[in-house]
């Protein structure tokens, strides 16, 4: 099979960050993750795109429109698309205080705006914004009914 039509194959960039740092393996730069993704091939099948975490050190969620355009061009030059985006939600858990929940919703909103800009630039023809409650199972289990309502 020389071409994969469905499902779209994407490589996530956040494994280049998560679990890495001064006390572990070095962070893999965003540019390196792009190059590795573009170069990867198995039996003639290549990745269609990347999924990105909207958090440092790879992506600044508050980057300018020009910065977003540069990001889109960088990905497009490698014949890749951007699919799912991971919202940076750990600043305020969905089951936290009123202020925490407001921050959580704001991060999701900003991620959606970022994703729309990528779509408008033609680099994100499909995709989702991934979120997590940023809350532990143990805290959720203390009051599953009401905590599920808070998360949902």
Question: What are these model-predicted stretches?
Answer:
Residues 1-125, 139-142, 149-150:
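N-terminal pre-domain/capping segments
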Residues 134, 144-145:
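Short acidic, low-complexity segments enriched in Ser/Thr/Gly/Pro
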């Amino acid at each position: 099979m020389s071409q994969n039509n469905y499902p779209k194959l994407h490589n996530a960039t956040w494994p280049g960050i998560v679990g890495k740092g001064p006390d572990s393996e070095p962070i893999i730069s965003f540019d390196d993750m792009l190059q590795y993704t573009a170069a990867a091939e198995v039996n003639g099948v290549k990745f269609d795109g990347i999924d990105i975490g909207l958090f440092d050190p790879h992506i600044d969620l508050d980057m300018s429109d020009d910065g977003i355009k540069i990001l889109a061009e960088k990905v497009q030059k490698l014949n890749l698309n951007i699919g799912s985006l991971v919202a940076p939600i750990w600043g305020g858990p969905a089951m936290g205080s009123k202020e925490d929940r407001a921050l959580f919703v704001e991060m999701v909103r900003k991620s959606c705006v970022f994703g729309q800009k990528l779509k408008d630039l033609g680099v994100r023809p499909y995709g989702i914004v991934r979120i997590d409650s940023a809350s532990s199972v143990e805290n959720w289990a203390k009051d599953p009914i009401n905590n599920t309502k808070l998360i949902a």
